[in-house]
């Protein structure tokens, strides 16, 4: 018995040593762990680019500064790169980062040509999307001029009163004078004050002068700006000056946002929300009609009259018999995101719930909770959780970011698990950037982002990348849908449709769809690489 115990102890010790050896082997080339208190540590390797923004003004050049490397490291370096981390063995207690170099989807000659074309398209995009409202303006110190910092807006070819203009001059002067200058519009006054001289009414440059400061300020309250150049969404940087002082502020020139409202619906007795009137369930199916019928049957247990929209690109489509199902057929193998676009295009309700065709509704699939979140918060989309046959449920909460790269190389896309913060008022919900393939969203917002039909095989997070900075995304772990089991019992008959589905859904290593996706991301989003952890 004693020998058996000794053998057991020796075996445990041997396993422990082996584990430590594997840990050392996988981490000996990795950078050392950062200080727990540090948010960032400078990367090992080539020195970073000089930060020109830290250069002093000439009058302050003689003053020494001690640079705080940890804080400087938090600033954009405009020189991003993607590197895998965590060693070759996927140990559960080590941070794993997978990196993909999108440039590998091109040969050298093609990469040079496509990079030039991409940069040309990028510059054209900047010209279209930027306006003077994006220009940095610095307010001067101790200026006697009072003016609006922001919030001045006019519709194209319309006129407004300009609020907040005033001269707060402390010294007594014989004549108080101010000047206004614009580039996309003209100045005028809605009324004339006796004792104030106006020069340039109806012109881009207007001068106002008076020996009485109060009269000048009363006249400034009546100044109007008129948009004279039709541009649907731009800004005019205007100048406001007096003797020895000049300031600039922007006047936004754009149409006000046009609302897309949905009429309120009557509530069923005792219900908080009329789900059938508020929500349409959308799905994309391909060959798996047994799974699709199981999904529909599970939905009908809890929501018997909610509309279900199906986009179907199967080779031999089968009819679905249900009075509240809209079944739309597509060319065979048209694609995953193309089907999403078709399904969402037919939704007429305020919200659309996206589900996979192999999901199963249960008592925990409470759409009322997701509707409540969107009704009471500014979120545009909220995901739930998907429960596997093992009992494990995932929300697939993802934090997404794009870091600037060196000129001409493109940016770096970062993806990691997590969330930004909890959603106030909803204890099981958080704010994040990407969620699992089970979400409720505002229909008009999903349409504005859209699903790129060029992604026809495997895609999901690309939708959230397209919506990054536009879609406000949340996730709730207490609204759960089941995922049908993928386990194939050996005694069941072979399903030719399932084999065809697997070839399309899970492309092999030699399949070109993954390369095509990398080429698309390289050009479309001006990316050079991406990492996931």
From Swiss-Prot:
Annotated Gene Ontology cellular component terms: Golgi apparatus; Golgi membrane
Record topological domains on the Cytoplasmic side: 1-7
Sites carrying sugar chains: 79, 179, 274
EC number: 2.4.1.92
CDD domains recorded: Glyco_tranf_GTA_type
Disruption phenotype: No visible phenotype, excepting a slight decrease in neural conduction velocity from the tibial nerve to the somatosensory cortex. Mutant mice display impaired motor coordination and balance. Sciatic nerves from over three month old mutant mice show signs of Wallerian degeneration, with redundant myelin, degeneration of myelinated fibers, axon dysmyelination, and an apparent decrease in the diameter of myelinated axons. The distances between neurofilaments in myelinated axons from over 3 month old mice are shorter than normal.
GO molecular function terms listed in the Swiss-Prot or TrEMBL record: (N-acetylneuraminyl)-galactosylglucosylceramide N-acetylgalactosaminyltransferase activity; acetylgalactosaminyltransferase activity
SUPFAM superfamilies: Nucleotide-diphospho-sugar transferases
One Pfam family per UniProt: Glycos_transf_2
Gene3D superfamilies, alphabetized: Spore Coat Polysaccharide Biosynthesis Protein SpsA, Chain A
Keyword Transferase carried by entry: yes
Transmembrane segments: 8-25
Localization annotation: Golgi apparatus membrane
InterPro entries to which the protein is assigned, alphabetical: Glyco_trans_2-like, GM2_synthase, Nucleotide-diphossugar_trans
Tissues and organs where the protein is expressed, per its UniProt entry: Most abundant in brain, liver, lung, spleen and testis.
Main location as per UniProt: Golgi
Record's bilayer topology term: Single-pass type II membrane protein
Keywords in alphabetical order: Disulfide bond, Glycoprotein, Glycosyltransferase, Golgi apparatus, Lipid metabolism, Membrane, Signal-anchor, Sphingolipid metabolism, Transferase, Transmembrane, Transmembrane helix
Disulfide bonds: 429-476
Any one GO BP annotation for this protein: nerve development
Function: Involved in the biosynthesis of gangliosides GM2, GD2 and GA2. Involved in the biosynthesis of gangliosides GM2, GD2, GT2 and GA2 from GM3, GD3, GT3 and GA3, respectively.
Family as reported in the entry's similarity comment: Belongs to the glycosyltransferase 2 family.
Assembly description: Homodimer; disulfide-linked.
Identification of the protein by name: Beta-1,4 N-acetylgalactosaminyltransferase 1
